[in-house]
Amino acid sequence: MAFLLHQARFFTTVNHLRDLPPTVQPEIAFAGRSNAGKSTAINVLCNQKRLAFASKTPGRTQHINYFSVGPAAEPVAHLVDLPGYGYAEVPGAAKAHWEQLLSSYLQTRPQLCGMILMMDARRPLTELDRRMIEWFAPTGKPIHSLLTKCDKLTRQESINALRATQKSLDAYRDAGYAGKLTVQLFSALKRTGLDDAHALIESWLRPAAADEDHAAVAE
């Protein structure tokens, strides 16, 4: 099966809101704590080894990185890799800059159609993960959570983590969050959940094409 995400390439790096590209294509943001496996997951989803840089130093990635998706001449969408958060040794000024950059981008970018929130399956929904959800909540746009590194858990532990996270997300819905809140298990190493993640992300990027595919299957 050919995936749209496999046609991804580096587009630009942004350090300030004023530098966001004046593009019109839909965007999907990828967010997560430092060491949640965000860069590795992006690389696996896009079937590339070094598309997103996975730093060995937590908190090193301090910019918003854009990747275009689709034909090089006419990209159809952008993947947006947000700075990892939660690393204690990052200076206070840098943390403040990241928070302003992240919250403003998530709340005001009209091209943004959804957020993929990466959380370590062993430690889901930390305080900072919840803050990301709460920043994004006013938009009413969907959030899909990937519980990464689930290969480090037993099957029963994975099931328990998935159920507990879904229950916590349901509480946001009960409190009035308008957007869809979904979650799945994911392992870049074992490729667990890869097809499900592909299908969901591509349905956000090109819903018309996804509807056509579903209609064709139904026939």
Swiss-Prot record:
Name the residues that bind Mg(2+).
39, 61
Q: Which Pfam families match?
A: MMR_HSR1 (PF01926)
List keywords of the entry alphabetically: Cell cycle, Cell division, GTP-binding, Magnesium, Metal-binding, Nucleotide-binding, Septation
GO MF entries: GTP binding; metal ion binding
Residues involved in GTP binding: 32-39, 59-63, 81-84, 148-151, 185-188
Gene Ontology BP, a term: division septum assembly
Q: Does the keyword Methyltransferase apply?
A: no
Gene3D superfamilies in UniProt:
P-loop containing nucleotide triphosphate hydrolases (3.40.50.300)
Task: Extract one GO cellular component term from the record.
Answer: cytosol
The cofactor named in the record is: Mg(2+)
Q: CDD domains, alphabetically?
A: YihA_EngB
Family annotation (InterPro entries): G_ENGB_dom, GTP-bd, GTP-bd_ribosome_bio_YsxC, P-loop_NTPase
Enumerate the spans annotated as EngB-type G domain: 24-207
Tell me the domain of life: Bacteria
Instruction: Give the family this protein belongs to, as stated in its UniProt record.
Output: Belongs to the TRAFAC class TrmE-Era-EngA-EngB-Septin-like GTPase superfamily. EngB GTPase family.
* Role played: Necessary for normal cell division and for the maintenance of normal septation.
> In its UniProt entry, what is this protein called?
Probable GTP-binding protein EngB
Instruction: Identify the species of origin.
Output: Burkholderia thailandensis (strain ATCC 700388 / DSM 13276 / CCUG 48851 / CIP 106301 / E264)
Q: Which gene encodes it?
A: engB
